[in-house]
């Protein structure tokens, strides 16, 4: 394989989490198009009850549940809720806000159930992705990870805290490191007190383990994998994420900070790896971010040296090649792989 040129930016999409855990026992993490199919396979802690409720809502809109993508349905709820606020019906309105709330909790639960071995266990055991581990081991100081995923597959796949840690590695300071999940992570990864992260993990849509933001720091959840009921009722947990709607407020912190840093790093990296990310047509903000990166790099003749693409869908890879062609210049190299597993094997050759 051609020698990797650093600094590297890696973009992990939902397909990377799916591919990384696909051969691990249990239900795999979803991609957009099969989210509701995956949700319908989950058991325990009131999740089937919530899934049934959400699927009934989906059926009411489309007269089917199969083939309805998560983003399609969420955007439908979001836009109808907005219409209902200013163009009120003379008849009995639907409670679109309730439907959004139910779906957001189901999203959280699906990503918990599919990334741990047993949600019923006293101590939750997260699944490990050997594929992610191999990829992360190739990174060097000043490389950057960008993801639109909420799950913690990347965090759990670091073999140690040598390159990255959860205290300062998210591109923002965090609090809550002495409790629960964060305490366990730091211990398992043999974190040395005071050691700084050498790479950043920019989670542009938020994370399962983020509880709140106070203007300067993100508070980590002590139990990000918690799914439970209380007195027979489904327990809803608050997390800091941007739901998959059209109105993502990336212009507000902490997301504003992450998107700004992502753009700066994409504009100066030598190598870009896009793994399991399909750049859906509905994600206009991501389209604009990448289009602006291509425009500025082409205008400065600051071309990418290497572009790595891993996705089973050939049309997805072609879409990225077409998008990045102006930023590759006459000598940029493009490498295509069927999936993240093939990619993780080839980068060691």
Where are these regions (language model features)?
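Gly/serine-rich nucleotide phosphate-binding loop at the start of the catalytic core
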Residues: 1-166, 343
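A Trp-anchored, charged/polar loop motif used as the substrate-binding/catalytic surface
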Residues: 124-131, 178-189, 245-264
């Amino acid at each position: 394989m051609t020698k990797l040129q650093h600094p590297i930016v890696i973009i992990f999409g939902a397909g990377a989490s799916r591919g990384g855990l696909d051969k691990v026992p249990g239900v795999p993490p979803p991609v957009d198009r099969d989210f509701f199919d995956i949700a319908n396979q989950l058991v325990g802690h009131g999740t089937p009850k919530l899934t049934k409720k959400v699927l009934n809502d989906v059926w009411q809109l489309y007269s089917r549940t199969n083939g309805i993508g998560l983003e399609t349905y969420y955007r439908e709820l979001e836009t109808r809720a907005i219409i209902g606020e200013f163009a009120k019906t003379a008849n009995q309105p639907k409670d679109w806000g309730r439907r959004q709330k139910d779906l957001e909790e189901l999203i959280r639960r699906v990503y918990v159930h599919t990334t741990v071995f047993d949600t019923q266990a006293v101590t939750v055991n997260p699944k490990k992705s050997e594929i992610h581990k191999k990829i992360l081991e190739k990174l060097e100081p000043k490389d950057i990870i960008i993801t639109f995923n909420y799950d913690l597959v990347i965090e759990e796949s670091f073999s140690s805290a040598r390159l990255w840690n959860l205290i300062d590695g998210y591109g923002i300071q965090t609090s809550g490191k002495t409790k629960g999940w964060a305490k366990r992570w730091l211990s398992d990864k043999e974190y040395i007190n005071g050691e700084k992260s050498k790479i950043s993990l920019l989670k542009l849509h938020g994370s399962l383990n983020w509880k709140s933001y106070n203007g300067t720091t993100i508070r980590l959840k002590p139990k990000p994998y918690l799914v439970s009921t209380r007195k027979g009722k489904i327990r809803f947990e608050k997390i800091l994420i941007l739901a998959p709607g059209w109105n993502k407020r990336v212009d507000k912190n902490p997301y504003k900070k992450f998107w700004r840093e992502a753009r700066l790093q994409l504009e100066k990296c030598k190598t870009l790896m896009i793994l399991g990310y399909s750049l859906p047509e509905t994600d206009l903000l991501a389209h604009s971010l990448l289009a602006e990166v291509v425009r500025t790099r082409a205008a400065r003749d600051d071309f990418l040296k290497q572009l790595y693409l891993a996705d089973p869908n050939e049309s997805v890879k072609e879409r990225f090649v077409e998008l990045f062609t102006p930023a590759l210049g006459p000598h940029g190299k493009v490498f295509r792989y069927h999936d993240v597993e093939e990619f993780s094997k080839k980068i060691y050759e």
